[in-house]
Structure formats: C-alpha cells, structure tokens
C-alpha cells in the first residue's frame, strides 16, 4: 500500500513532479544554499547549478566566488579557492549533503527513494516531507517545497548530526543547451589535488 494512498492530491503532485524532471535531459537553475552545522552559525552561498543526465552536475558559486563542485558522472570534485585545493571523491562514496539532489539526475521516483511521504499546503505551494528508505545515507529527512507548476522550489536536507542544508531554486530552465566541457573538472593553476579522506 502506498505511503500516501489516501491522499490523491499529494500522489498527483508527486507524479507531476516526477514527470517534469524525468523528461528533462538537462536543467539549469539559480540556487541559494544555507548550511547550518550543529551549534554553529548559518553559512549562505549562491550560484548557478546545471545538470545533465546521467549523473552530471556543476555548481558554480558566485558567493564565495570561484568555489566549484563538479560531477562527471563517476567522480565528484570540490574546489575551494581560499585554499586553492581540489578534492576528488567517487560519486557513490560521497557523503556530501548535495548528494540527495543527485536523484534529479536519474529517474525521480519518490516511492522508491523515500518513505513516510507527507504533504502540507503552504499557500499556493506544497511542502513534502520524507525520509530516505536506506539508513546508509548521511541524512535523516528531506523536505521539498513544490509550486503549482510542479517545480521544486526548495530542498531541505537534515543530517543525522542535526545539520541542515537548504537549497532555494529560481529561474529554472529545462533542457537548455549545455557544453559537455562544463562537466569536466579543470584544476586551476597551482591547485593542490587530493583524494577524499587524505
């Protein structure tokens, strides 16, 4: 039995969101990211996110300028300009809190990925709360805020350590032309290259 069998409106909304993002081959959107570690001040960053199926994404940060997060479908690269350091990790091994967004790069299926799905109206928008189906992920809960046009406007991820990472999206473009080179990490001159965990 479906986790929301009694809520046809929520089920219809989820199917609409799935259809919107599953049809897209590429996506471009502006993001604002708030990260709040436990017991510490919130950190706000922003920039442009581009996605290409399967498994490729690029986060170009305007704030802090020069920060870069790239997935070529196999590896994730995180470049921090303050340290002039590039860290590489395997996509499946990443416990980065951006990873929950990776499902947008594949076949979005709320029922497959999440459990305890619930919806709550907030004006013209709906807040969907869910938990990951597997305990092997570094987060315990995910919230999506979805508009009447089935666009995901907000994704909030809560980690097991009670940290929160919230993304707000605007200016979404579905299926823009994207240069394949966007998803190939090019290390800036003199950057220190390290493997994750070293």
State each model region's role:
Residues 3-7:
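Boundary at the C-terminal end of the N-terminal hydrophobic targeting segment
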Residues 101-117:
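Anionic-ligand binding region
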Residues 16, 21-73:
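N-terminal mature ectodomain segment of secretory-pathway/periplasmic proteins
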Residues 48-99, 165-166:
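An acidic-aromatic
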Residues 12, 87, 112-198:
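Gly/Pro-enriched, hydrophobic low-complexity segments
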Residues 39, 82-84, 161:
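Solvent-exposed strand-loop boundary residues in beta-sheet-rich modules
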């Amino acid at each position: 039995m479906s986790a929301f069998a009694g809520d046809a409106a929520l089920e219809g909304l989820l199917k609409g969101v799935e259809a919107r993002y599953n049809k897209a081959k590429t996506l471009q959107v502006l993001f604002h990211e708030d990260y709040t570690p436990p017991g510490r001040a919130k950190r706000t960053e922003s920039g442009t996110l581009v996605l290409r199926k399967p498994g490729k994404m690029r986060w170009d940060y305007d704030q802090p300028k020069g920060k870069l997060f790239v997935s070529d479908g196999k590896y994730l690269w995180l470049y921090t300009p303050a340290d002039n350091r590039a860290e590489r990790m395997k996509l499946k091994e990443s416990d980065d809190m951006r990873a929950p967004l990776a499902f947008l790069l594949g076949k979005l299926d709320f029922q497959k990925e999440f459990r305890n799905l619930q919806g709550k109206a907030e004006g013209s928008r709906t807040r969907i709360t869910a938990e990951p189906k597997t305990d092997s992920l570094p987060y315990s809960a995910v919230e999506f805020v979805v508009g009447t046009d089935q666009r995901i406007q907000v994704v909030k991820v809560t980690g097991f350590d009670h940290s929160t990472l919230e993304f707000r999206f605007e200016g979404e473009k579905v299926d823009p032309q994207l240069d394949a080179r966007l998803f190939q990490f090019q290390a800036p001159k003199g950057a220190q290259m390290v493997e994750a965990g070293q």
